[in-house]
């Protein structure tokens, strides 16, 4: 996917900002696509998003893969698959799409999907995704919907908790280092 204004990534940043205010979870957003090459305004849109990330104080919470490397990182299929496996959910706020392949990709790995209520997403997601209206629902309302989903789904809470509290760096610091210091 390409980073274009119709993808509505600014809304995703605002949603994340509100989500992080609801509770103490370390919610993060990874934006995988580079700026679309066919519209000269797209690099400017990325600059707007980077400025918004700073304004919302999300510098450590929002990651644009495109900016992580020189030359820019454009994830291959294996990397995207790994991101789906590791993710807690797919946030897809696009205002317009032709089909919505990420819904299929996230669905195949049982990832919860939170997406704009537009015809292609409705057709693909049916009743198995969480819809929001990007024109009517505020970022705070969408954040509350996402928060409530995770609060009510134990399997998803467990996955997030295990990943947050049992990363190798945490296990080493909390379990192995104390054992080694005893000797």
Protein language model regions, located:
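Short hydrophobic beta-strand element within catalytic cores of glycosyltransferases
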Residues: 103, 108-115
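A structural motif in glycosyltransferase catalytic domains
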Residues: 12-16, 29, 142, 175
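A short hydrophobic beta-strand element within the catalytic core of glycosyltransferases
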Residues: 90-91
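Aromatic "clamp/platform" in nucleotide-sugar-dependent glycosyltransferases that forms part
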Residues: 95
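Nucleotide-activated donor-binding/catalytic signature segment of Leloir-type glycosyltransferases, i.e.
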Residues: 42-81
């Amino acid at each position: 996917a390409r980073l274009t204004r119709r993808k509505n990534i600014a809304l995703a940043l605002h949603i994340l900002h509100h989500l992080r205010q609801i509770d103490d979870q370390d919610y993060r957003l990874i934006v995988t696509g580079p700026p679309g090459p066919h519209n000269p305004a797209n690099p400017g849109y990325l600059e707007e998003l980077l400025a918004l990330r700073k304004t919302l104080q999300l510098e450590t919470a929002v990651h644009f893969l495109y900016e992580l490397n020189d030359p820019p990182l454009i994830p291959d299929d294996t990397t995207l698959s790994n991101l789906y496996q590791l993710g807690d959910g797919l946030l897809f706020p696009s205002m317009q799409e032709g089909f919505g392949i990420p819904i299929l990709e996230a669905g195949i790995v049982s990832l919860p999907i939170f997406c704009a209520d537009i015809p292609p997403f409705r057709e693909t997601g049916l009743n198995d995704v969480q819809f929001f209206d990007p024109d009517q629902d505020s970022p705070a309302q969408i954040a509350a919907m996402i928060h409530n989903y995770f609060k009510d789904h134990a399997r998803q809470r467990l996955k997030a908790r295990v990943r947050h509290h049992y990363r190798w760096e945490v296990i080493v610091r909390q379990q192995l280092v104390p054992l080694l210091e005893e000797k």
